[in-house]
């Protein structure tokens, strides 16, 4: 099933163009229900957790978590998306270059609770912003080019602090009917990408088919949420 999308490639410029043209059907104006439902499982009794949002867009989930006392670091290629996040949430923000990543900028709210890096995700590393106690991956693994998934998994694992709890949202559908993105990521691939380094637990599986996906030609869509934690070192 994976071979149907194996060679599909989206250039970074195409994602930036989608923001320029406001073709952002993937953006959700409300906090994602899967995050709200599984929040306690991720926080696990901790307060002031550092959260990482790969390919963050202007997700309102980031403000929600900051308002709950956590801090958020996101990475996004589109400067427009980052500016819209701060403007639409009425946050004053600063803008600085990132010496460790040529051409990158970091935008931060005045409270310092939200820091968004404008750069290629694969230019980012723990050397730039440390490791994280939580990760919310909605629209990231399913958006990167399928051929980059091994590299992506290695990056994400390198960003996980020992106590990190990684909430991963994936989509199941018939890839013969739609070429993506968002791409089809079966549970077996989650296991093959992360299983050697992480314990993987399926938390939730829901029917997520809407008229938007029907317009893509799909007749079924399942959304799965997994919780990944680093395996104890031997």
Summary of predicted features, one role per range:
Residues 135-136:
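Hydrophobic beta-strand segment of the Class I
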Residues 52-59, 140:
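Class I SAM-dependent methyltransferase "Motif I" SAM/SAH-binding loop
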Residues 2-46, 58-62, 70, 74-128, ...:
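Class I (Rossmann-like) S-adenosyl-L-methionine-dependent methyltransferase catalytic domain
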Residues 143-155:
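A short, conserved alpha-helix within the catalytic core of class I
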Residues 23, 139-140:
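Short amphipathic alpha-helical interaction patches enriched in hydrophobic/aromatic residues
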Residues 48-50:
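Nucleotide donor/acceptor-binding cores
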